[in-house]
Structures are given as structure tokens and as C-alpha cells.
């Protein structure tokens, strides 16, 4: 009776060893290198802080236009990453380019006054165009994966990035003067005399900043296959400041991570 038990034990042990060896082989065949592609929805926050009237910087003249005071913009952009998985910890380098934010405004101001025997109307028209563009962001992240089970892996991390932000402003102001003579006695009012000329030369300015910014990231990875992971994530990034203008982004993303 003993030999069959011994044979069964040996057979079971050999099968168990074979399965473990195969699993180890499959796990060992997974490269630590990976690439990831994401589509991100970004909420961009541009805040223009003016100096206090009694503060130390009260006399400082800003080169950043008032176009960029408390802007709330949104954009969708792609992002690509390459990384290395240490088994629990990952590092990744990423690159993204954002959509240019643009704004135009038009204003009209009319002033009417009496000058001797005439009515004088002065109309001032202002046309302004502004743009703010986070042209590029090159970042490096350190990420920690929480392995809840074989499929779901929440993660958190920190990111440092080199970003380039620039803005441009162009404005034109035109003044139109209309003079109409008053009626006198039985004489009707005279026809208007109109004169149009630029009240100010066209104005243009362009400034940019390149600096290191800091951010945090979090998300959840779902392993579809041993090599393919669906990733949903959030990241916050502070781009730094261009004088008294701060630029920050909140991003939600969906992407795929492929391990070689």
C-alpha cells in the first residue's frame, strides 16, 4: 500500500514544482521596462496676483497683461511616458504639450460734449487679443503601487517637471470723432464731420518662463493581461510663476500601459 502513496506524493510534488517553475519563468520573462500613452483632460488655472497698495512691491510694474487675471480654461491633450518597474516602485519620464488658450475682447466708449456751436462725440474702440500657452512639460515621476490583488493596483507618486509657458498680447485702440453743428434759428443742423485715427500705437508684448515645477499623482491600474494595464489617474502640477502670475493644472487621464 505504501508504494502507491509514495508515487502519488512524487507525482504531486513534481506537478507543483513544474507549475511554480512555469510561473516563475513567466514572471521572470516580464521586462521591467514599459511605455504608456494617456489622453488627459486638464483644468488650467491662471491666477494674476496684484501687489498690495501698501506692500513692498507696490511700485513694481508687471509685464504680464491683465488678460491673465484669474483665468479658468480647459483642454484635452495626449501624454506619453516611458518607465521602469522595480516591483512595487516605478519611475517614469513623461512628455505633454497643451492647447493654447486664447481670448479676444472688444469695448466701445462714447463721450458727447457741447463745444460752442457744435456737438462733439468721441467714440473710442478697443480690440484686444491675448494667448497663454503651456507649450511643453517634461516630467519625472516616482510612483508606488499598492498591490491589492492580482488585478487592481492603486498608486500614488510625486512628480517634478520642466515646463515652458509663454503668453502674448496684441491690442489696437481707435478713436472716432464726430462733430455736428447746432441748429441756429431757422437754420437746420449741419452735417456731421467724422474723423477717425488711432489714438494709440498698436501694442504688443510677449513673455515666457521656463522653470521646474512640482506635483502629485494618484490613480488605479487594472491588469488586463500580464503585459497590458488600463490606467486611470489624476495629477496636480504647479508650473511656477511668471512674475505675479501663477499657472497650475489639474488633470484626469485614461491610458494604457504596456510592459515589454
Curated annotation (Swiss-Prot):
Region (Disordered): 173-205
Transmembrane segments: none
GO molecular function: porin activity
Stored Gene3D superfamilies: 2.40.160.20
InterPro entries per record: OMP/PagP_b-brl, Opacity, Porin_opacity
Disulfide-bonded cysteines: none
Gene encoding the protein: opr
Protein name from the UniProt record: Opacity-related protein POPM1
Keyword check for Transmembrane: yes
Low complexity: bias regions: 174-186
Cellular compartment(s): Cell outer membrane
Family: Belongs to the opacity porin family.
Main subcellular location of this protein, as a coarse class: membrane
Record-level GO cellular component terms: cell outer membrane
Entry keyword annotation includes Ubl conjugation: no
Source domain of life: Bacteria
Keywords of the record: Cell outer membrane, Membrane, Transmembrane, Transmembrane beta strand
Amino acid at each position: 500500500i505504501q508504494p502507491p502513496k509514495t508515487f502519488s506524493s512524487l507525482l504531486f510534488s513534481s506537478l507543483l514544482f513544474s507549475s511554480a517553475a512555469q510561473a516563475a519563468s513567466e514572471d521572470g520573462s516580464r521586462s521591467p521596462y514599459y511605455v504608456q500613452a494617456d489622453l488627459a483632460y486638464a483644468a488650467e488655472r491662471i491666477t494674476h496676483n496684484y501687489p498690495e497698495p501698501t506692500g513692498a512691491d507696490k511700485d513694481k510694474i508687471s509685464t504680464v497683461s491683465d488678460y491673465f487675471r484669474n483665468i479658468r480654461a480647459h483642454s484635452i491633450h495626449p501624454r506619453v511616458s516611458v518607465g521602469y518597474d522595480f516591483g512595487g516602485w516605478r519611475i517614469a519620464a513623461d512628455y505633454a504639450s497643451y492647447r493654447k488658450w486664447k481670448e479676444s475682447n472688444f469695448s466701445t466708449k462714447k463721450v458727447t460734449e457741447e463745444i460752442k456751436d457744435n456737438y462733439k462725440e468721441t467714440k473710442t474702440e478697443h480690440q484686444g487679443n491675448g494667448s497663454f500657452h503651456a507649450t511643453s512639460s517634461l516630467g519625472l515621476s516616482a510612483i508606488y503601487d499598492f498591490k491589492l490583488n492580482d488585478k487592481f493596483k492603486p498608486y500614488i507618486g510625486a512628480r517634478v517637471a520642466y515646463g515652458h509657458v509663454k503668453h502674448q498680447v496684441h491690442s489696437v485702440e481707435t478713436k472716432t470723432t464726430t462733430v455736428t453743428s447746432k441748429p441756429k434759428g431757422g437754420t437746420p443742423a449741419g452735417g456731421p464731420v467724422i474723423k477717425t485715427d488711432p489714438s494709440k500705437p498698436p501694442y504688443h508684448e510677449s513673455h515666457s518662463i521656463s522653470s521646474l515645477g512640482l506635483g502629485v499623482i494618484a490613480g488605479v491600474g487594472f491588469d488586463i493581461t500580464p503585459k497590458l494595464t488600463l490606467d486611470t489617474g489624476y495629477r496636480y502640477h504647479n508650473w511656477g510663476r511668471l512674475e505675479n502670475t501663477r499657472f497650475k493644472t489639474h488633470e484626469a487621464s485614461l491610458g494604457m500601459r504596456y510592459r515589454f
